Amino acid sequence: MDSQLKKKTTFKRLLGYIKPYKAAFIAAILCMIGYSAIDTLFLSQIETLIDDGLTEQDSNILLYGALFVPFIFILRGSLNVASSYFLHWVGFKVVTKMRQQLFDHMMKLPVGFHDQHSTGDLISKITYDTQQVAEASSRAVLVLVKEGAFVAGLLGLMFYQSWQLSLVFLVIGPLVAKVVGVVSRRFRKVSSRIQTAMGNVTTTAEQMINGHKVVIMHQGQKGESTRFSEINNITRNQNMKLVNTRAISTSVIQFIASLSLSMVLVIASFPEMLGELSAGAFTTLLTAMIMLLRPLKQLTNVNSDFQRGIAAATSVFAILDEPIEVDKGSRVVDRAAGDIVFDDVTFSYQKDDEPALEHINFKVDQGKTVALVGRSGSGKSTISNLLTRFYDVEQGSILLDGHNINDYKLKCLRRQFALVSQHVTLFNDTIANNIAYGASKDVSRENIIKAAEQAYVTEFTDSMPKGLDTMVGENGVMLSGGQRQRIAIARALLQDAPILILDEATSALDTESERHIQDALGTLRKNRTAIVIAHRLSTIENADEILVMDNGEIIERGTHQQLLDQEGAYFQLHNLQFSGSA
């Protein structure tokens, strides 16, 4: 019952997408009904042609028929074109709207959602699932209305000719309904598996493409091929189950219909029935019954399209029903001063996980620089995730200029931070547009060039034919790691936010580039609050305070010299790095 209720809810919700285009949708339905009515009208004239035209040898009937046929087929063809156009126009409008809605909603979902779902699966929702909704639903409506109207017309014609024989034929109704009910459940289950399988195909392909260099360097081609083959075969198997179910159900329904047709022929052979039916009437009745098998087959098959569309829509709506980021804040400031306080902050990524941060307390005064150091997994990057509210704290509070960061509107809060991560994201656009990406106001070419010069981007773009107008390729594939990172730093320079978060910002730079960038960052940090997450201790020696982290806790704090004098964890890290580089 829950499954049926969910299906009805999904169907009603899907109809809501059609509502804005109901005029075109109604026009499509009327054209389809008209198409089926013409087919029924054409069949109804068989009796006249046989009884009056041939049996009575009335040549006028045959001549009128010769004029009637071309006209009726021109009208029939016009209605077919119109119905197909209007229906697919509505279908593409629906999928465009749904795809845009899904894309926009995914951007509003919290970072935690994206961390728990594979990129390939989410891409498959936007590309494959939405397309399935449009294609399957359009085909389902086309067949359902057109063939349904044709079935209604044929049944009316059959009852007009002989209601007794028509009743015998209708015995198949309950049996067909039973078969369709069983098949519907099967279609829905298999279609849902196909959505999941296609998501896995996309994910596996995406991982191989993104990690192509790693795959070939570690001779992982065979393993990746085997993994993809297994997933690909699962998709094939599920599709074959769908095809087999459709073929078997069609054959069963047609067999049931053939038994009913046999009964009609037996009853029609009785003397009293032979006396009632003319040759034309019986031919019309028999033709209508035979013609009824085709739309019955189509209507059985349309169930698979309908169930596939419902399964895809359910998958899409599941994402659309995911709650977006909580933004209850109302405080808006043009530019924050930059005072930051972590007050007894504890946080876990998952409820049952060990805390990523535990009882964290520290303060960063306006214009000061605090560095976070420690081994991987100690909680350094988690602090930047909490500051920008990619995640919300479970215990304690984070203050910005004396106000809880939850009190700020999200857009306003994130506008106060310029984040440069070790994982640089570039878009398939020009270098200049990547630097200017997300700028809160229109920026001049001069400002872009200035930021590029400060981040030493022009050092490599000056040798390029198109300079800053050079396309970077997908995620900056045409550039080196150091070049990508310099573009990200130029983006932060242009953003001119009061607070900087540098998460291993110089990790991909060579020694010469790092020296240039350190000079640029030194200029950038003036009169700005900066939180620097660093692995290379040489980059944070001048920080106002250094926090040493381990297992989500701050175990040491002080200036570079103070921490060296303590001869604790920082002292050991320092010796390890500099003895290794000596």
Curated annotation (Swiss-Prot):
Kindly give the membrane topology term recorded for this protein.
Multi-pass membrane protein
Matching InterPro entries: AAA+_ATPase, ABC1_TM_dom, ABC1_TM_sf, ABC_transporter-like_ATP-bd, ABC_transporter-like_CS, ABC_transpr_lipidA, P-loop_NTPase, Type_1_exporter
Give the catalytic activity. Answer: ATP + H2O + lipid A-core oligosaccharideSide 1 = ADP + phosphate + lipid A-core oligosaccharideSide 2
Source organism, top-level taxon = Bacteria
Location in the cell: Cell inner membrane
TM stretches of this protein: 23-43, 61-81, 140-160, 163-183, 247-267, 273-293
Q: How does it assemble?
A: Homodimer.
Comment text on domains: In MsbA the ATP-binding domain (NBD) and the transmembrane domain (TMD) are fused.
Protein name listed in UniProt: ATP-dependent lipid A-core flippase
Species of provenance: Idiomarina loihiensis (strain ATCC BAA-735 / DSM 15497 / L2-TR)
